[in-house]
From Swiss-Prot:
Coiled coil: none
Residues engaged in binding ATP 2: 349-356
Annotated NCBIfam families: PRK10636.1
Disordered: annotated segments: 525-563
Entries under InterPro entries matching the protein: AAA+_ATPase, ABC_tran_Xtn, ABC_transporter-like_ATP-bd, ABC_transporter-like_CS, ABCF_EF3_subfamily, P-loop_NTPase
SUPFAM superfamilies: P-loop containing nucleoside triphosphate hydrolases
Function: Genetic data indicate it may be involved in ribosome assembly or function.
Keywords: ATP-binding, Nucleotide-binding, Repeat
The keyword Oxidoreductase is assigned to this record: no
Biased composition, class Basic and acidic residues, residue ranges: 547-558
Domain ABC transporter, first and last residues per copy: 2-246, 313-531
Positions that bind ATP 1: 34-41
Record protein name field: Probable ATP-binding protein YheS
Organism: Haemophilus influenzae (strain ATCC 51907 / DSM 11121 / KW20 / Rd)
Length: 638
C-alpha cells in the first residue's frame, strides 16, 4: 500500500501540494491527472525517492521493487535486446556473480546462483525481451542493431521496454505513449491490463487510461482528490460535482447546447453506418462530460473558411517517396484520393507504412514521383507536424508571430486571441526559445486556426498537449467545416473528429470499412500472419542461395539510395555530440556555488543565456535528426 499523509510539496516558491492525503492499494492501477505544472512529475520524484516533501510523508513497503522509464539513452554499441535486458537489474547482478564464480571454479556458488536464476525465470529473458521489443514496433533485425543506430523516439521505446522487463511491485509511467504510434499504444495498453503489480500512470490519452486504471488521483487546488473508476467515470463524477456549483451552470448549458446542435446536424448527414454509430456514441459522451471542462483555459474555435472549393484536392494514380530519378525510393503507389468540403479522414497503418509521407504529399512538402496531385484554386492549407514547431522564430514572442500574421489587428485584439490558447500577460512577450514543447505546439495551432484553413492536415497534433488542450482541440475540430486529414495515436480525438478511415499499408492507401475496434482486430490478424510467415520462412530452404543473392543485391541498391540521407544523419549526430559537450561544460560551470555570489552576476547571466542558446541549438538539431531518421525508416521499410 502507498500512503500519502498530509503531504506538502513546493517547486521553488510554488506550492504544489498542501496537507494532501491519499491511499493506493496493492496491485491497484491509478491514473494521476491534473493540469500541466500541478505537481504530477514531482509526485513521481517523491515515489522514486529523488525528492523530499516539505511536510508530511510518503510510505510504501521497503521491499517493493520500483521500476520507471529512464529519460536518457546514451549512444551505446550494445544491441537493443541486450540494452533492454539490462533493465532486469537482479538478473544482471546474478550474471556478474556467476561469471566470477566460474572464474574461481566455485561449484557450490555456481549451483546456488543457477537456482536463483531459475527463480527469476532467467532462461526466458531473451524471448521476453524480444516479445517486448516486437510489441513496441521493433523488427527482428532491429533487435540486434546497436542502440546508437536508433533515433531519439526509438531510444525512448527501448527505455520503456527496459522498465517493463524489470520485475516490479510498483511501476511508474510518465506519458509512456508520447513516442509511440497507434499500434504500439494498443499493444502497451494490453500489456498494462495484464500487469500484476501496482501501477501509477500519468497520461494525457483518456482512451489509453480507461481500460487500464481503476482509480484516478486528480491534483487540483493543491490536494490529491480520489475518484473510484476509470477516466471516463472520473469525468462524469467531476462534471456532476461542478454542475452543482451554480455559478458555472449557464456556461455549462451553453457548452452542452453547442454540442447538441452539432450532434443533431451529424445525425442528419450520417451515411456510413459503422463509423457513424461509433462517432455518435463519442459525441454524445462529449456532451455528457462537457461540464467537466467548463473551466478549461483553452477557448478557441475554427472560424468558417472564406471559401470551400469542391473538390479541394484530387490525387490520381500518384506515387510518393523520397529522392529523385533512379535513386528515388517509392513509399506509396497508385494513390487515388479526393478531398471535398466536409471530408473527415483518419489515417491508420503501422509505423513506417507511409502515413506521414501521404500528409507531406498533400501539404506539398513532397512532389509526386508519378501521377498527379491537383489542389483547387483557393485552397487555404493548415498543416501541423512536429517539425512545424521549428519554423517558429526562437528569439521572437507569441505576440510578434501573431502580429506578423495579422498586422491589421490591434495589440489588444491579438492578446485576446492568444488568451484563448492560454497565453496571458507577460507570456505573450516571452521569446519562443523559452517555451516548452506544449507551448510551441499551442502557438503553431493558434497561427493555423487564425488563417481559417479549408484543408487541415494534422500529423500527431496531440504530442506535447495536456488533457485540457486535447479536449479543446477535439471540440474545435468537431465544429470545423473544411476538409480534415489526421494521423494520431489519440483515439478519443479520432473517434470524435473523423467520419472515415483510410488504411496505409503495403504501399497502398485504401478505405478501411470499420471503426477503431475493427482496426485493432485487423492489427491482431496482421501480427499473427507475420509470425506465421517468419516460421514458414525458417523452414523453407528451397532456392535459398538464389534468395540470398537477390537479397544482397537489394540491400546494396538500398544502401546506395539511402547513402545521402545516412551521411546527413551522421553529420547531425556529430553536431548533437558537439552541442551536448558544450551544454555539459556550461552546466558544470553553473554547478559552482561561487558563481552565485554578487560579484559574479555578469558571468552568471552570460552563462545562463549561453545555456538557453545551446539547448535551443541542440533541440533544433535533434528535431532535424529525428525527421531524417523517420525518412530513413520509411525508405528501409518500402
Amino acid at each position: 500500500m502507498i500512503i500519502f499523509s498530509n503531504l506538502s510539496l513546493k517547486r521553488g516558491q510554488t506550492e504544489l501540494l498542501e496537507n494532501a492525503s491519499a491511499t493506493i492499494n496493492p496491485k491497484q492501477k491509478v491514473g494521476l491527472v491534473g493540469k500541466n505544472g500541478c505537481g504530477k512529475s514531482s509526485l513521481f520524484a517523491l515515489l522514486k525517492k529523488e525528492l523530499m516533501p516539505e511536510g508530511g510523508e510518503v510510505n510504501y513497503p521497503a521491499n517493493w521493487r520500483v521500476s520507471w522509464v529512464n529519460q536518457e539513452t546514451p549512444a551505446l554499441d550494445i544491441s537493443a535486446i541486450d540494452y533492454v535486458i539490462q533493465g532486469d537489474r537482479e538478473y544482471c547482478r546474478l550474471q556478474q556473480k556467476l561469471e566470477r564464480a566460474n572464474e574461481r571454479n566455485d561449484g557450490n556458488a555456481i549451483a546456488r546462483i543457477h537456482g536463483q536464476l531459475e527463480t527469476l525465470d532467467a532462461w526466458t529473458i531473451q524471448s521476453r525481451a524480444a516479445s517486448l521489443l516486437h510489441g513496441l514496433g521493433f523488427s527482428q533485425e532491429e533487435t540486434i542493431q546497436p542502440v546508437k543506430a536508433f533515433s531519439g523516439g526509438w531510444r525512448m521505446r527501448l527505455n520503456l521496454a527496459q522498465a517493463l522487463l524489470c520485475p516490479s511491485d510498483l511501476l511508474l509511467l510518465d506519458e509512456p505513449t508520447n513516442h509511440l504510434d497507434l499500434d504500439a499504444v494498443i499493444w502497451l495498453e494490453r500489456w498494462l491490463v495484464q500487469y500484476q503489480g501496482t501501477l501509477v500512470l500519468i497520461s494525457h490519452d483518456r482512451d489509453f487510461l480507461d481500460p487500464i486504471v481503476t482509480k484516478i488521483l486528480h491534483i487540483e487546488n493543491q490536494k490529491l482528490n480520489e475518484y473510484t473508476g476509470d477516466y471516463s467515470s472520473f469525468e462524469v463524477q467531476r462534471a456532476t460535482k461542478l454542475a452543482q456549483q451554480t455559478a458555472m451552470y449557464r456556461q455549462q448549458q451553453q457548452k452542452i447546447s453547442h454540442l447538441q446542435k452539432y450532434i443533431d446536424r451529424f445525425k442528419a448527414k450520417a451515411t456510413k453506418a459503422k463509423q457513424a454509430q461509433s462517432r455518435m456514441k463519442a459525441l454524445e459522451r462529449m456532451e455528457l462530460i462537457a461540464p467537466a471542462y467548463v473551466d478549461n483555459p483553452f477557448t478557441f474555435e475554427f472560424r468558417p473558411p472564406q471559401s470551400l472549393p469542391n473538390p479541394l484536392v484530387m490525387i490520381e494514380q500518384a506515387s510518393a517517396g523520397y529522392g529523385i530519378g533512379e535513386s528515388a525510393v517509392e513509399i506509396l503507389s497508385k494513390i487515388k484520393l479526393n478531398l471535398v468540403p466536409g471530408s473527415r479522414i483518419g489515417l491508420l497503418g503501422k509505423n513506417g507504412a507511409g502515413k506521414s509521407t501521404l500528409i507531406k504529399l498533400l501539404a506539398g512538402e513532397l512532389t509526386a514521383l508519378s501521377g498527379t496531385v491537383q489542389l483547387a484554386k483557393g485552397v487555404q492549407l493548415g498543416y501541423f507536424a512536429q517539425h512545424q514547431l521549428d519554423t517558429l522564430r526562437a528569439d521572437e514572442s507569441a505576440l510578434w508571430h501573431m502580429q506578423k500574421l495579422a498586422p491589421e489587428q490591434t495589440e489588444q485584439q491579438v492578446r485576446d486571441y492568444l488568451g484563448s490558447f492560454a497565453f496571458h500577460g507577460d507570456k505573450v512577450n516571452q521569446a519562443v526559445k523559452s517555451f516548452s514543447g506544449g507551448e510551441k505546439a499551442r502557438l503553431v495551432l493558434a497561427l493555423i486556426v487564425w488563417q481559417r484553413p479549408n484543408l487541415l492536415l494534422l500529423d500527431e497534433p496531440t504530442n506535447h498537449l495536456d488533457l485540457d488542450m486535447r479536449q479543446a482541440l477535439t471540440e474545435a475540430l468537431v465544429d470545423y467545416e473544411g476538409s480534415l486529414v489526421v494521423v494520431s495515436h489519440d483515439r478519443h480525438l479520432l473517434r470524435n473528429t473523423v467520419e472515415e478511415f483510410y488504411l496505409v499499408h503495403d504501399k497502398k492507401v485504401e478505405e478501411f470499412k470499420g471503426d477503431l475496434e475493427d482496426y485493432q482486430k485487423w492489427l491482431s490478424e496482421q501480427n499473427s500472419t507475420s509470425e506465421n510467415k517468419v516460421s514458414e520462412k525458417v523452414g523453407d530452404n528451397e532456392n535459398s542461395v538464389q534468395n540470398r543473392k537477390e537479397q544482397k543485391r537489394r540491400e546494396a541498391e538500398l544502401r546506395q539510395q539511402t547513402a545521402p540521407l545516412r551521411k546527413k544523419i551522421t553529420q547531425l549526430e556529430e553536431k548533437m555530440n558537439k552541442f551536448s559537450s558544450e551544454l555539459a561544460n556550461i552546466e558544470n560551470q553553473l554547478a559552482d556555488t561561487e558563481l552565485y555570489n554578487a560579484e559574479n552576476k555578469e558571468k552568471l547571466t552570460a552563462l545562463l543565456a549561453q545555456q538557453v542558446d545551446v539547448k535551443k541549438a541542440l533541440d533544433d538539431v535533434e528535431t532535424e535528426w529525428m525527421t531524417a531518421q523517420e525518412e530513413l525508416e520509411e525508405m528501409l521499410q518500402a
